[in-house]
């Protein structure tokens, strides 16, 4: 299984994703600049955190129009795993690959800390190594992480089991229904504000994010 880590101008978590997958998990990974237009030969695509295009207009709004996005859309349509963390989540909503939107934190401040999450759905490509209802801790670092959707869309997300992670002890940004991460209806596209790639080694003080990447790899092995 080969992973593409997309590099947008302003990405700053691309190296973290690469290291989590390649160094820690031993996966086959390559960087792909957003100016490229093809993802041929890749089996999964990862959209990193950061500040693509300086978050001008809106977080993720300009990145949505880069050359690589049509190929990412095709990967999603083909049922291949597509993952976005933080700014990657914002880009996925801007591209219409995930419902809802991410708006400014209720505090109007940048929030950087570790938060407790609840695994709301472990029946996905990304969460099979977790237990439903399990509490985990992951870092967050964002100013525009408050998930919003209109009431009808929000109800549909809930009814379909698309909520994968929820904030548990506290809601750090005002996200509706304490939502921290969601999938598309098909379940092969995941966006989340927390950073699992920053919690994959004991040296970092936490390994709760490691099982997300192992879940993807295990899914590939099962399919093979």
Curated annotation (Swiss-Prot):
Keywords assigned: ATP-binding, Cytoplasm, Glutamine amidotransferase, Hydrolase, Ligase, Nucleotide-binding, Purine biosynthesis
Residues at the catalytic site: 86, 195, 197
The enzyme's E.C. designation: 6.3.5.3, 3.5.1.2
Stored InterPro entries: Class_I_gatase-like, PRibForGlyAmidine_synth_PurQ
Catalytic activity entry: N(2)-formyl-N(1)-(5-phospho-beta-D-ribosyl)glycinamide + L-glutamine + ATP + H2O = 2-formamido-N(1)-(5-O-phospho-beta-D-ribosyl)acetamidine + L-glutamate + ADP + phosphate + H(+); L-glutamine + H2O = L-glutamate + NH4(+)
GO molecular function, one term: phosphoribosylformylglycinamidine synthase activity
A GO term from the CC aspect: cytoplasm
Localisation: Cytoplasm
Record keyword Nucleotide-binding present: yes
Domain Glutamine amidotransferase type-1: start-end pairs: 2-224
A biological process from GO: 'de novo' IMP biosynthetic process
TM stretches of this protein: none
Matching SMART domains: GATase_5 (SM01211)
Superkingdom of source: Bacteria
Principal subcellular localisation of the protein: cytoplasm
Pathway: Purine metabolism; IMP biosynthesis via de novo pathway; 5-amino-1-(5-phospho-D-ribosyl)imidazole from N(2)-formyl-N(1)-(5-phospho-D-ribosyl)glycinamide: step 1/2
Function summary: Part of the phosphoribosylformylglycinamidine synthase complex involved in the purines biosynthetic pathway. Catalyzes the ATP-dependent conversion of formylglycinamide ribonucleotide (FGAR) and glutamine to yield formylglycinamidine ribonucleotide (FGAM) and glutamate. The FGAM synthase complex is composed of three subunits. PurQ produces an ammonia molecule by converting glutamine to glutamate. PurL transfers the ammonia molecule to FGAR to form FGAM in an ATP-dependent manner.
HAMAP family documented for this protein: PurQ
Subunit annotation: Part of the FGAM synthase complex composed of 1 PurL, 1 PurQ and 2 PurS subunits.
Record protein name field: Phosphoribosylformylglycinamidine synthase subunit PurQ
Species for this entry: Lactobacillus delbrueckii subsp. bulgaricus (strain ATCC 11842 / DSM 20081 / BCRC 10696 / JCM 1002 / NBRC 13953 / NCIMB 11778 / NCTC 12712 / WDCM 00102 / Lb 14)
Lineage: Bacteria, Bacillati, Bacillota, Bacilli, Lactobacillales
Designated gene of the protein: purQ
